[in-house]
Curated annotation (Swiss-Prot):
The protein, known as: Pantothenate synthetase
Catalytic activity of the protein: (R)-pantoate + beta-alanine + ATP = (R)-pantothenate + AMP + diphosphate + H(+)
One Pfam family of this chain: Pantoate_ligase
Entry annotated with the keyword ATP-binding: yes
Localization (cell): Cytoplasm
Disulfide pairings: none
Recorded family membership: Belongs to the pantothenate synthetase family.
Residues that hold beta-alanine according to the record: Q60
Function per UniProt: Catalyzes the condensation of pantoate with beta-alanine in an ATP-dependent reaction via a pantoyl-adenylate intermediate.
A GO term, aspect molecular function: pantoate-beta-alanine ligase activity
Organism: Ruminiclostridium cellulolyticum (strain ATCC 35319 / DSM 5812 / JCM 6584 / H10)
GO biological process, one term: pantothenate biosynthetic process
Gene (name only): panC
InterPro entries hit by this protein: Pantoate_ligase (IPR003721), Pantoate_ligase_C (IPR042176), Rossmann-like_a/b/a_fold (IPR014729)
Length: 281
């Protein structure tokens, strides 16, 4: 495994792989890797070579968000990537990705108006810009994203389609702790009491999933029950809890098409997300 931090080095290495006819998979991350990221890296090994990018992207953090506090441990991440069989790690400094005079961004108006885009207005502009740059730098055959960030996955797929990029975007299932909590780098912010309280997210998700499987199709009934579970926890504060069309990200009243049920919930000061999708017969 090789680790580099300049765009020039990545391009040269990948160019050499491509000359040999090798396929390349990219796993974009912000580091502080856990088993969720690990599942993406393992899936990406269906390619000849695996590139993992580690970059805490300042452009996707709002002015009051946790950029400086976001957990980082590059040495541990490198060891983990090597254990999982990654071939190349790209961990640039902010100045490498956004040099002086950088003034271009990629924005998407339609799919960013709901869910995380509503409470984090500039977030997806930052996501689209950095993902676009990484796809251009690495030029992978496939790129891998977790379904926990479901809205991000939909947006990246649309961006790749709209900009005629010949890259397959692969979504990978949510990986959970043994007690059900979706794995997230931000889980490390939780103290023991908050960690216990955070289980209301997965409890609500599992209840909602069960209701839909048993035939519930009215989203107001579904969301009311899911909200009641979260409201029982004093440390929990709902940012959003919505049912949206998986293609348009617009809210729906009836589950008569593929639907995403998504939530963002503050546990104390820590914002966590979770979701499930359902495709009716």
């Amino acid at each position: 495994m090789k680790s580099v931090n300049t765009i020039h080095e990545v391009k040269n290495i990948v160019k050499d792989w491509k000359k040999q006819g090798l396929s390349v998979g990219l796993v974009p991350t912000m580091g502080y890797l856990h088993e969720g990221h690990g599942s993406l890296i393992l899936k990406a090994r269906e390619n000849s070579k695996v590139v993992v990018s580690i970059f805490v992207n300042p452009m996707q953090f709002g002015p009051t968000e946790d950029l400086e506090k976001y957990p980082r441990d590059l040495e541990k991440d490198l060891k983990y990537c090597e254990e999982l069989g990654a071939d190349l790690i790209f961990s640039p400094e902010p100045g490498e990705m956004y040099p002086e005079g950088f003034c271009t961004s990629v924005d998407m108006s339609v799919l960013t108006e709901e869910l995380c885009g509503l409470s984090r207005p500039s977030h997806f502009k930052g996501v689209c810009t950095i993902v676009n740059k990484l796809l251009n730098i690495v030029n992978p055959d496939r790129a891998y994203f977790g379904e926990k960030d479901a809205q991000q996955l939909v947006i990246v797929k649309r961006m790749v389609r709209d900009l005629n990029m010949d890259i397959e975007i692969v979504g990978c299932p949510i990986i959970r702790e043994k007690d059900g909590l979706a794995k997230s780098s931000r889980n490390t912010y939780l103290n023991s009491e908050e960690r216990r309280a955070a289980l209301v997210l997965s409890k609500s998700i599992f209840t909602g999933k069960d209701m839909v499987k048993k035939g519930c199709r009215e989203t107001d009934v579904l969301l009311k029950k899911m909200k009641a579970i979260i409201d029982q926890e004093p440390l929990a504060r709902i940012d959003y809890l919505k049912a949206v069309d998986t293609m348009t990200m617009q809210q729906v009243d009836t589950i008569d098409r593929p639907v995403l049920i998504a939530m963002a919930v503050y546990i104390g000061n820590v914002r966590l997300i979770d979701n499930f999708s359902f495709i009716p017969d």
